[in-house]
Amino acid sequence: MHIFGGTGPVGICAGILAAGCGANVFLGSHLGKRISQEVANEYNKRFDVHMQGEDFGSKKSILKSLETSDVVMGTAKAGIQILSKDHLKQAKRMIVVADVNAVPPLGIEGVSVNDMGKELEFTPKKAAGIGALAIPGIGPFIVAGP
């Protein structure tokens, strides 16, 4: 799981929860790998999880991370688009993309605030898009299963 905007409070919380469930978590930041790794180290120690820092400061580094990611989450601050359709078109393994940003412009282009598993036709694997206002609604499905 790659978390864009991962060094902020929402990204850190999502990362801790995912890592606690066994996910391979990368907290990404536009500030570079050193900063994101420092944040990951701090919370790894505090919550006994394993997260890694990742550099999302350039288009090249973003595209490189998307090559290996199954799950992508956008948690950057409101009003910043962190991933475009052009980015997502190159995410060959991505099956789920979630965006917690509900303020225009949305954080991940193509994912609307109310999307609940919307098939993103423009992605290689037709990834499921989950919008900010739908995220609270998936909790019961995660706990109970389909």
What is each model feature region?
Residues M1-V71:
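Glycine-rich phosphate/diphosphate-binding loop of Rossmann-like nucleotide-binding domains
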Residues G11, Q81-L83, L106-G107:
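Glycine/Thr-rich phosphate-binding loops of Rossmann-like dinucleotide-binding domains
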Residues L31-G32, N101-P104:
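Short, acidic/turn-prone active-site loops that include or flank metal/cofactor-
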Residues D70-G74, V97-A98:
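N-terminal Rossmann-like NAD(P) cofactor-binding module of classical short-chain dehydrogenase/reductase
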Residues A76-A78, N101-A102:
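Short glycine-/small-residue-rich Rossmann-like dinucleotide-binding loops
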Residues G79-M94:
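Rossmann-fold NAD(P) dinucleotide-binding segment
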